[in-house]
Amino acid sequence: MKYILLGLLLMVVLANANRLADPNCGVCTLRSICFMEKESCPKGFKMLCF
């Protein structure tokens, strides 16, 4: 259980670091309405659109 939580925390940190590098890149969240792929985003990251 501890390792699962650490993994989730690491994913959040990496996602936020990526978002700082390119504000248009983000990861899927339950709050988001839709997602669009963006070529400049690293693989697995998507552009947030609200």
UniProtKB/Swiss-Prot annotation:
In which tissues or organs does this protein occur? Expressed by the venom gland.
Indicate the transmembrane segments per the record.
none
Keyword terms: Disulfide bond, Secreted, Signal, Toxin
Would you identify the family this protein belongs to, as annotated? Answer: Belongs to the scutigerotoxin-02 family.
PTM remark: Contains 2 disulfide bonds.
Protein name, as recorded: U-scutigerotoxin(02)-Tl3a
Places the protein is found: Secreted
What's in the GO CC field?
extracellular region
- The leader peptide range reads 1-17
Q: Does the keyword Secreted apply?
A: yes
Single Gene Ontology MF annotation: toxin activity
Q: Which domain of life is it from?
A: Eukaryota
